[in-house]
């Protein structure tokens, strides 16, 4: 398929091998887009063992995969909480790839970061989560959105979570930022529709990623359970009997990026195997 031929996408939080961000980048490239691959730089020693063993280089490895598909790719170390970093990234995308037609806001602190009851979590954990997941979203949309207005339109896809639909005990900071994403998305849809910019959300349910494995590990640790207990229990409880794959999440993002969703804006699509039907 080449329904994104001639378009340029910018995807944040795309440096993990077993991550939704990388899967999104590869699907968009498969459908014809050139891609700006961004993430906050990580020291290789912090990579999961399987990434270290394979010589994974984060966003540069993802960009190499895109180039191997015959598409252009630009890898940019970008901290979404830093407005200067974001502007530098946008400027590089315009200079080297000609503009930005698609923005996928995938960068986020994982749900287990600072997991604690609201009355017990530290201020530092609260502010850090809000800074990355909400302020980072705000800054990224402003930097890229202004360029989209100049270019005559575009599609913005925000990656939320089922945690943006329901509260989850001990994950108040994460849930609050994802709920806020929904409000901001609807507001932007109202404000940008006449500029031919659509703004939508994908809400992944439990997905087989390193980030999700970290959440399960945190559950097991807090509960004093054997590693893997929570993951097995969730899989048994899911309606389809399994977690989503990253490719299944990426397919919905590609749909929202394309003209196949040209009359959709302000919407939130659950990709959770039927866990929530609203």
Over which residues does each language-model region extend?
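Canonical Rossmann dinucleotide-binding motif of NAD(H)/NADP(H)-dependent dehydrogenases/reductases
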Residues: 3-42
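The beta1-alpha1 cofactor-binding region of Rossmann-like NAD(H)/NADP(H)-dependent oxidoreductases
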Residues: 56-57, 77-89, 123, 246-248
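Substrate-binding pocket helix/loop in short-chain dehydrogenase/reductase
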Residues: 114-118, 122-130, 234
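Short C-terminal tail/terminal secondary-structure segment
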Residues: 115, 166, 236-242, 253-254, ...
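Active-site helix of classical SDR
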Residues: 141, 177, 185
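Residue(s) in the substrate-gating loop at a strand-loop-helix junction
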Residues: 161
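Short, small/polar-rich loop/turn modules that mediate ligand/substrate recognition or access, typified
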Residues: 193, 198, 264-266
């Amino acid at each position: 398929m080449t329904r994104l031929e001639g378009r340029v996408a910018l995807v944040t939080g795309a440096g993990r091998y077993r991550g939704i961000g990388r899967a999104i980048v590869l699907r968009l490239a498969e459908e014809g887009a050139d891609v700006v691959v961004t993430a906050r730089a990580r020291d290789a020693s912090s990579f999961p063992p399987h990434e270290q063993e394979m010589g994974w280089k984060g966003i540069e490895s993802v960009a190499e995969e895109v180039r191997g598909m015959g598409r252009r790719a630009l890898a940019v170390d970008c901290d979404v909480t830093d407005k200067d970093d974001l502007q530098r990234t946008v400027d590089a995308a315009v200079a080297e790839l000609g503009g930005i037609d698609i923005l996928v806001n995938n960068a986020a602190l994982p749900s287990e970061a600072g997991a604690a009851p609201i009355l017990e979590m530290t201020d530092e954990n609260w502010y850090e989560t809000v800074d990355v997941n909400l302020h980072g979203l705000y800054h990224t949309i402003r930097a890229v959105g202004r360029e989209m207005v100049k270019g005559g339109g575009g599609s913005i896809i925000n990656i939320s979570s089922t945690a943006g639909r329901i509260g989850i005990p001990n994950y108040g900071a994460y849930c609050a930022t994802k709920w806020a994403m929904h409000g901001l998305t609807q507001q932007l849809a109202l404000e940008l529709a006449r500029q031919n910019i659509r703004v939508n959300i994908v809400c992944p349910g439990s997905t087989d990623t390193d980030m999700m494995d970290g959440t399960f590990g945190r559950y097991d640790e807090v509960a004093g359970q054997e590693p893997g207990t929570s993951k097995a229990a969730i899989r048994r409880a899911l309606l389809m009997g399994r977690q989503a794959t990253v490719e299944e999440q990426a397919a919905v993002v590609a749909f929202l990026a394309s003209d196949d969703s040209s009359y959709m804006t302000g919407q939130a699509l659950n990709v959770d195997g039927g866990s929530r039907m609203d």
